[in-house]
Swiss-Prot record:
This is Ubiquinone/menaquinone biosynthesis C-methyltransferase UbiE. GO terms for biological process: aerobic respiration; menaquinone biosynthetic process; methylation. The keyword Ribonucleoprotein does not apply. InterPro entries: SAM-dependent_MTases_sf, UbiE/COQ5_MeTrFase, UbiE/COQ5_MeTrFase_CS. It is an enzyme of class 2 (transferase). Methyltransferase required for the conversion of demethylmenaquinol (DMKH2) to menaquinol (MKH2) and the conversion of 2-polyprenyl-6-methoxy-1,4-benzoquinol (DDMQH2) to 2-polyprenyl-3-methyl-6-methoxy-1,4-benzoquinol (DMQH2). Belongs to the class I-like SAM-binding methyltransferase superfamily. MenG/UbiE family. It comes from Paraburkholderia phytofirmans (strain DSM 17436 / LMG 22146 / PsJN). Transmembrane segments: none annotated. The gene is ubiE. It catalyses: a 2-demethylmenaquinol + S-adenosyl-L-methionine = a menaquinol + S-adenosyl-L-homocysteine + H(+); a 2-methoxy-6-(all-trans-polyprenyl)benzene-1,4-diol + S-adenosyl-L-methionine = a 5-methoxy-2-methyl-3-(all-trans-polyprenyl)benzene-1,4-diol + S-adenosyl-L-homocysteine + H(+). One of its GO terms (molecular function) is 2-methoxy-6-polyprenyl-1,4-benzoquinol methyltransferase activity. Pathway: Quinol/quinone metabolism; menaquinone biosynthesis; menaquinol from 1,4-dihydroxy-2-naphthoate: step 2/2; Cofactor biosynthesis; ubiquinone biosynthesis. S-adenosyl-L-methionine binds at T69, D90, D116, A117.
Length: 243
């Protein structure tokens, strides 16, 4: 069986899927609180920037992959309007349930679907916009997932990938201390789960850097790929177009 990484561990590919599922079953209930604590609320600004770059218009069809608690889906549903179609999806049932309930509480009615990004259950050339926020790094076969995202885009459709990336070098030491000391402490203190937040820090370090992800998106068939560094590269937004 092929090996892959789960944080810094080398594991069988099948085991990774189960381990990642376990992480997100564990963190789902406290996901929004922990995002605010870990990022000092900055995740909201990163998502707002992504929403602005997506430029969803009335009537658009949008696929939100790894949609989690629904921040992007909520905004896109309002922008696409009654004539549009926004799918809130996640591979993790616990995250999808929390997101669906949160959207309903906000009065946002949009379809929710359990979805594996490596096997997207939609036809070719269907969506105007596909987004994945803080989900790509957890996928076992990122190249397969990116190719699938491109497949379901319409010609001239755009893929937006918001993900942790490589921080500016002068901040690396401070960022490492924060990631490997503070994040697990926050996880234990507020969610009684240090291990999942240790995985978060490790998975960020194993994720491709800005230029590598840009190349991967190009190899998946996307054109005009560019990226925006946010918060000194803690996060990057990559945008590519299908032609």
């Amino acid at each position: 069986m092929s090996k892959t990484h789960f944080g810094f561990q080398s594991v069988d590919e099948q085991d990774k899927a189960q381990k990642v599922a376990g992480v997100f079953h564990s963190v789902a209930a406290n996901y929004d609180l922990m995002n605010d604590l870990m990022s000092g609320g900055l995740h909201r600004a990163w998502k707002m920037f992504t929403i602005a770059q997506a430029n969803v218009r009335p009537g658009y069809k949008v696929l939100d992959i790894a949609g989690g608690t629904g921040d992007l889906s909520k905004a896109f549903a309002k922008q696409a309007g009654d004539t549009g179609e926004v799918w809130h999806t996640d591979i993790n049932e616990s995250m999808l349930r929390v997101g669906r309930d949160r959207l309903l509480d906000k009065g946002v009615i949009t379809p929710a679907l359990l979805c594996d990004a490596e096997k997207i259950p939609f036809p070719d050339n269907y969506f105007d916009v596909v987004t994945v926020a803080f989900g790509l790094r957890n996928m076992t076969h990122k190249d397969v997932a990116l190719a699938e995202m491109r497949r379901v885009l319409k010609p001239a459709g755009r893929l937006l990938v918001l993900e942790f990336s490589k921080v500016w070098d002068p901040l690396k030491k401070v960022y490492d201390v924060y990631s490997f000391k503070v994040l697990p402490w926050l996880g234990e203190r507020f969610a009684k789960d240090a291990e999942s937040y240790q995985y978060l820090a490790e998975s960020i370090r194993m994720h491709p850097d800005q230029e590598t992800l840009k190349t991967m998106m190009e190899q998946a068939g996307l054109d005009g790929v560019k990226y925006y560094n946010l918060s000194a590269g803690v996060v990057a937004l990559h945008v590519g177009t299908k032609y």
